[in-house]
């Protein structure tokens, strides 16, 4: 089994709680219950409002994780952080890990940070309530009928900010610093097109002449195209944006 994975090099990720992780499957010292499989390790998981994206990406603990992977052998650190993928692969399933022969170079970072809240205009049942303000309001109404709905949908695990549109962070300046290494930016919510603050990041990348080299992706229900988002795709690298 290969221990190498490109995600510690190529992805900059934070979850719905505003917590940094090496990837969405990583087992970390998450401050809240209810994260992936409820599993935890002692790998640091700082919050977005406490540590900047570049500080996390270039932190000593992320460097150590990359160093262990370059070594080619399973270490206690890899066993802890990558436990979910390792277990999947032991059971014959394909994990999220992306084995490569060499560490990636150049533009490799995929920015996948939940920075702009969880405001959403729909209440789709496949979405977790922490990712949709409409689902949260729906759950609150159901709880008036029967409190067990809150327990079933893990309402008690929500942060107060999540109940009022989610957490909103301004990391534009730090994203600009990382821009020369960014390959892709994935805007996620909630519903991105009712979150106008994400355009501040896009405008900043255009101003420093980096947008043309970055692929732009959206996780969207495509029901609220009130901003002319296609204007931003003209600054794409070979028109590769996925909207």
Task: Please describe what each predicted stretch is.
Residues 90, 125, 132:
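Short functional micro-motifs and their immediate structural scaffolds
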Residues 83-84, 122-129:
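C-type cytochrome heme c attachment motif
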Residues 232-243:
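Single conserved hydrophobic/aromatic residue that forms the stacking wall/gate
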Residues 173-178, 204-209:
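Leucine-rich repeat
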Residues 108-119, 128-167, 180-196, 208-228, ...:
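Core AdoMet radical
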Residues 1-99, 109:
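Accessory C-terminal segments flanking Radical SAM cores
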Residues 93-102, 132, 136-140:
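Short cysteine/histidine-rich zinc-coordinating motifs and their immediately flanking basic loops
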């Amino acid at each position: 089994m290969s221990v190498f994975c490109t995600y510690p090099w190529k992805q900059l990720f934070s979850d719905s709680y505003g917590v940094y992780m090496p990837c969405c499957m990583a087992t970390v010292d998450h401050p809240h219950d209810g994260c992936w499989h409820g599993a935890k390790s002692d790998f640091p998981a700082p919050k977005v409002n406490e540590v900047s994206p570049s500080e996390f990406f270039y932190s000593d603990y992320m460097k150590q994780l990359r160093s262990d992977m370059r070594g080619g052998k399973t270490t206690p650190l890899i066993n802890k952080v990558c436990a979910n993928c390792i277990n999947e692969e032991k059971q014959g399933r394909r994990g999220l890990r992306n084995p490569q022969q060499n560490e990636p170079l150049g533009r490799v970072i995929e920015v996948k940070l939940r920075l702009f809240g969880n405001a959403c205009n729909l209440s789709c049942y496949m979405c977790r309530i922490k990712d949709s303000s409409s689902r949260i309001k729906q759950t609150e109404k159901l709880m008036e009928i029967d409190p067990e709905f809150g327990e079933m949908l893990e309402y008690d695990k929500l942060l107060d900010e999540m109940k009022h549109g989610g957490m909103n962070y301004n990391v534009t300046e730090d994203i600009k610093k990382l821009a020369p290494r960014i390959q892709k930016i994935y805007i996620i919510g909630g519903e991105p097109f009712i979150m106008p603050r994400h355009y501040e990041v896009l405008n900043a990348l255009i101003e420093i002449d980096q947008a043309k080299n970055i692929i732009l992706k959206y996780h969207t229900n495509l029901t609220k195209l009130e901003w002319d988002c296609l204007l931003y795709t003209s600054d794409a690298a070979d028109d590769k944006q996925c909207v």
